[in-house]
């Protein structure tokens, strides 16, 4: 039997350290499921594992793409599943570490298939978003797929404020001439592994404190310079994310630098709250306090393995 040990939790909670400890114990490799860490141009602002951490265990899907590539969750599902299957040929265990709930779900449950979209359609949607803002995307989705718009409004309203997701919805509607929702739940996905889900959590005050500290460290490590280098490409889909978006507003003259830094902290805290909301929907996840001794978590996994045999 093959086991995918999946580690989830909010940003800055300690998932990387735990994943390395588990990879070393089970003598296996790590597949990253953090959609922000795929891109090689984004290092500091995405908290990519350090070189020492990368050397401690073999990682996959870390800085393996460029921000200039169009890389969807469907692309990731296909590539990551192929890599996981390859790793299972040599080992009964693979570690999946996830901060991006949608991408974790794609691996564990499968994702719906969507048609190829003309790059010109994608570029036009991106340009209109840059000119008209998130309201343009919201209005487009409301007109092109009112059923799905209503579903998001009721079940996951924060998605309406997510430029990456909204641009994807709209480009599929326009490019396919069909509602986005018409492509959902059309296939059943089978997985040839057993997932073991581990969640890390902490009191909100601790999470927020760790986030604030991480942002300060990022700024000291050169996040401002990294964002400045990326600023000419600020309209790219991959850069519509916390940590960069706020500094782009500083370069635009809309924010002072101290205000931009506080916005990064605030928006990252909000992001962590959304992460927890998403991950806690899965009742099969075993949650541990972030300070739990790693041997206790390893013991839980080993006992879980015994019961599944």
Curated annotation (Swiss-Prot):
Its cofactor is Mg(2+). It is an enzyme of class 2 (transferase). Its EC number is 2.5.1.75. Keywords: ATP-binding, Magnesium, Nucleotide-binding, Transferase, tRNA processing. GO terms for biological process: tRNA modification. ATP binds at residues 9-16. It catalyses: adenosine(37) in tRNA + dimethylallyl diphosphate = N(6)-dimethylallyladenosine(37) in tRNA + diphosphate. Pfam families: IPPT (PF01715). Substrate binds at residues 11-16. The record marks 100, 122 as: Interaction with substrate tRNA. Residues 34-37, 164-168 are annotated as: Interaction with substrate tRNA. One of its GO terms (molecular function) is ATP binding. InterPro entries: Dimethylallyltransferase, IPT, P-loop_NTPase. Monomer. Catalyzes the transfer of a dimethylallyl group onto the adenine at position 37 in tRNAs that read codons beginning with uridine, leading to the formation of N6-(dimethylallyl)adenosine (i(6)A). Belongs to the IPP transferase family. This is tRNA dimethylallyltransferase.
